[in-house]
Amino acid sequence: MAHKKVIVLVAGGTGGHLFPAEAVAVELRQRGYDVHLVTDRRAKCFVSCVDEEHTHIVSSATFTRRHPFALIKTCWILLKGMGQSLALFYKLRPVLVGGFGGYPTFPPLLVAALMRCVTFIHEQNAIMGRANRVLAVFVHAIAGGLLSQTGTHAHKTLLIGNPMREVVLKAAKIPYRPSLGEKPFHFLVFGGSQGASFFSRIVPEAIALLNNKIRRRLRIIQQVRGEVVELMKTYRSMGVQAEVAPFFNDMAERMAHAHFILSRAGASSVCEIAVIGRPALLIPYPYALDHDQAANAALLARVGGAQIVSEKDLTAQRLASLLTQACCAPHLLEKQALAAKKVGQPYATRRLADMAEALIAGRSLSDVREEFFDENAV
């Protein structure tokens, strides 16, 4: 009996990095590969599609500009991670190693390149992350989610889109139905892992400024950090129906049933909004490295699929005004939803798996580019 070919996927331990990697892992497993996931300890609460036997934790750390001793410690941890990766790859003998962003991808991808494995990285954002920027020099191909195909590595960059989990693709089949007349208006608010606390402050302030007629229609679903009880009390005192939680396991389904979304502009959020096709107000996280969230949001806003307001400009008064407009202009929201849907890339998972197989087969990048290039991917 022939052994299955091994593919190793590497991702940082947050949902934004892990979810695309998991989506591709499921697709490649269905194609007969033995897929392993390498990540860091933060991943335990996110990993669901890869079993414990196929999940490997490698030491990693983030470079900062702190004390020199901290820098030495970081270098030591990364070297330790390289040693762990070397031992793992000698055991698994992968035919392909792919990275999905975050500093934990650095040791395994660098080791894979030194071992002359076939390698690729996937960059979700419109602006390449710092770890990927270094790794781009060593890998055979770069798969872009929102990435521009210009610059130093344009010759090996393929714009494929961001892989979507099956739950997102299922949610994408639910058509957008505007809230007409006095019907309930579902308002979904989430801030990702960064900046949710800002929404916990600004949203109730804005709701307090709305007239009673609109407030009665609102059905708020809000993802928060640690303000659940306090926020629920605030909404109850205003007579607003709300559901508040630190995490929703069925977020894709909730997005599909939303009439309007308030969100940060991480690559995963932007692409899921596009694939599902929902109108959104995007507030880029102002402290994101290299302002990648602003660039992500601009791609969706450019086609009329979203509105953008900077955090410093989003006052309670402005949000209340935008919410009032949204509730009173259902057909405008429907138009925005259709615009977002047109640029969504629901087949990115399959196409990235196709690219991976093409690389394993030794096909040239020019052949792969011709088959997978799509300038409209979002």
Curated annotation (Swiss-Prot):
Reaction catalysis annotation: di-trans,octa-cis-undecaprenyl diphospho-N-acetyl-alpha-D-muramoyl-L-alanyl-D-glutamyl-meso-2,6-diaminopimeloyl-D-alanyl-D-alanine + UDP-N-acetyl-alpha-D-glucosamine = di-trans,octa-cis-undecaprenyl diphospho-[N-acetyl-alpha-D-glucosaminyl-(1->4)]-N-acetyl-alpha-D-muramoyl-L-alanyl-D-glutamyl-meso-2,6-diaminopimeloyl-D-alanyl-D-alanine + UDP + H(+)
Gene3D superfamilies, per database record: Glycogen Phosphorylase B
Major site of localization recorded for this protein: membrane
Keywords: Cell cycle, Cell division, Cell inner membrane, Cell membrane, Cell shape, Cell wall biogenesis/degradation, Glycosyltransferase, Membrane, Peptidoglycan synthesis, Transferase
Keyword hit for S-adenosyl-L-methionine: no
Top-rank EC class of the record's enzyme: transferase
UniProt membrane topology term: Peripheral membrane protein
Gene Ontology MF terms in the entry: UDP-N-acetyl-D-glucosamine:N-acetylmuramoyl-L-alanyl-D-glutamyl-meso-2,6-diaminopimelyl-D-alanyl-D-alanine-diphosphoundecaprenol 4-beta-N-acetylglucosaminlytransferase activity; undecaprenyldiphospho-muramoylpentapeptide beta-N-acetylglucosaminyltransferase activity
Keyword check for Cell inner membrane: yes
GO terms for biological process, alphabetical: carbohydrate metabolic process; cell division; cell wall organization; lipid glycosylation; peptidoglycan biosynthetic process; regulation of cell shape
Pathway assigned in UniProt: Cell wall biogenesis; peptidoglycan biosynthesis
Role according to the record: Cell wall formation. Catalyzes the transfer of a GlcNAc subunit on undecaprenyl-pyrophosphoryl-MurNAc-pentapeptide (lipid intermediate I) to form undecaprenyl-pyrophosphoryl-MurNAc-(pentapeptide)GlcNAc (lipid intermediate II).
Descriptive protein name: UDP-N-acetylglucosamine--N-acetylmuramyl-(pentapeptide) pyrophosphoryl-undecaprenol N-acetylglucosamine transferase
